[in-house]
C-alpha cells in the first residue's frame, strides 16, 4: 500500500464503506426484497447484468422493478456475501464477492421449495458526494438448485 498516511487511511475507510454498502444491499434483499432500499444504493444509470438467469437491467429503476418481481417468487433469502476483494482507485472501485444463498423459492409448479444459489458478484462502484454507489454489477449464477437435489445434480 503506497501513498501518504492520510491517503492510506482514506483507502481503508473507502474499503470499509464499500463493504458496508454491499452488506446493506444484502440486508435489503433479505428483508423482503426491499427494491426502494436497494435502488437507493445505486447510481440512477446503473447496470445490473444477471446473465441468462436474471437478465440485464439498465437503470436503477429497471433493476428495482426486477427486484420486486423476484420478491414475489422468493419468500425467504439469506444473502451471504463471502471472500470479498475490494480495490479502490480514487473515486472508483471494484468489488468482487461470492454469494452463498439458501432461500425458499417457487419451483416450476409454483410451490415453495428450499433452494441454493451459488453466484459471484463483480461490482464497479463510484463515489459521488462522498457516498459510494453501485454503477455496474455482473451477477454470475453458478447454480440455482433445489436443496434436496444438491448442486452436483443441477
For each predicted feature, which ranges?
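Short, low-complexity N-terminal intrinsically disordered segments enriched in polar/charged residues
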Residues: 1-35, 40
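A near-ubiquitous, low-amplitude feature marking generic local secondary-structure context
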Residues: 1-4, 8, 21, 46-50, ...
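A beta-strand edge to alpha-helix "cap/lid" segment located at domain peripheries
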Residues: 3-6, 72-154
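Charge-dense, low-complexity intrinsically disordered segments
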Residues: 8, 12, 54-57, 112
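Acidic side chains
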Residues: 14, 30-31, 45, 49, ...
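A solvent-exposed, acidic/Ser-Thr-rich amphipathic alpha-helical stretch
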Residues: 34-101
Amino acid at each position: 500500500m503506497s501513498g501518504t498516511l492520510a491517503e492510506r487511511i482514506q483507502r481503508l475507510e473507502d474499503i470499509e464503506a464499500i463493504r458496508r454498502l454491499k452488506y446493506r444491499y444484502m440486508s435489503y434483499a433479505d428483508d423482503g426484497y426491499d427494491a426502494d432500499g436497494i435502488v437507493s444504493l445505486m447510481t440512477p444509470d446503473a447496470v445490473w447484468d444477471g446473465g441468462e438467469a436474471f437478465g440485464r437491467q439498465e437503470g436503477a429503476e429497471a433493476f428495482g422493478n426486477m427486484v420486486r418481481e423476484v420478491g414475489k417468487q422468493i419468500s425467504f433469502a439469506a444473502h451471504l456475501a463471502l471472500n470479498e476483494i475490494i480495490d479502490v482507485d480514487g473515486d472508483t472501485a471494484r468489488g468482487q464477492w461470492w454469494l452463498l444463498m439458501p432461500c425458499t423459492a417457487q419451483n416450476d409448479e409454483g410451490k415453495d421449495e428450499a433452494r441454493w444459489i451459488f453466484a459471484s458478484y463483480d461490482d464497479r462502484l463510484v463515489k459521488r458526494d462522498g457516498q459510494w454507489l453501485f454503477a455496474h454489477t455482473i451477477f454470475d449464477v453458478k447454480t440455482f438448485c433445489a436443496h434436496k437435489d444438491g448442486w452436483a445434480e443441477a
